[in-house]
Design a protein with these regions (language model features):
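Rossmann-fold NAD(P)-binding glycine/threonine-rich loop
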Residues: 101-124
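N-terminal Rossmann NAD(P)H-binding glycine-rich loop of SDR-like oxidoreductase domains
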Residues: 4-19
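Short beta-strand element of Class I
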Residues: 28-30
Length: 163
């Protein structure tokens, strides 16, 4: 499996790539960032399966070229109101499965409108698979399954502030 990690040397992308780099199913991880030097430094800190490329996600042809022969696009490049739908559209057009950590509701709606296009292309697209939304939603689902009745679920997270 080949993974293109767009924004893969940002804080969330770094964590994700460190976490998956040693999975046996992964043949190659390509860290894609507008700053190739930063991407190379990070890629060099990981194992031999990881390389780096310069990618400007505003360049549609470069985006499409980067997705050639890719199985999964992991998009941790924000802001999602600007980059979410265009990167997902490129992944669908390229036949790449897609995962992101989008945490904004408006681009989520825009990306959900691409569902029929993704299904038609045989592409699986998972949006909002970060900490919140993502992990918090899965934890809520686990809790819901243990209860007889649920009327409302609220999720949130603490970023280290004081109350």
């Amino acid at each position: 499996m080949k993974i293109l990690a767009i924004g893969g040397c940002g804080s969330m992308g770094r964590y994700a790539m460190r976490s998956i780099q040693n999975y046996s199913a992964i043949e190659e991880i390509i860290i894609a960032d507008i700053n190739k030097e930063t991407a190379e430094v990070f890629a060099d800190s990981l194992n031999h399966k990881v390389s780096a490329i310069r990618l400007d996600v505003n360049d549609a042809s470069a985006l499409k070229q980067a997705m050639e022969d890719i199985d999964i696009v992991v998009n941790t490049c924000g802001p999602y109101f600007k980059f979410g739908a265009p990167i997902l559209s490129a992944a669908i057009s390229s036949g790449c499965n897609y995962i992101d950590i989008c945490d904004d509701w408006e681009p989520t709606i825009d990306m959900m409108k691409l569902d029929a296009k993704a299904k038609s292309a045989g592409v699986s697209a998972t949006i909002g698979l970060g900490a919140s939304p993502g992990l918090t939603n899965l934890m809520a689902l686990i809790a819901i399954r243990e209860l007889d009745e649920v009327t409302t679920v609220y999720t949130g997270w603490d970023i280290g502030g004081t109350s």
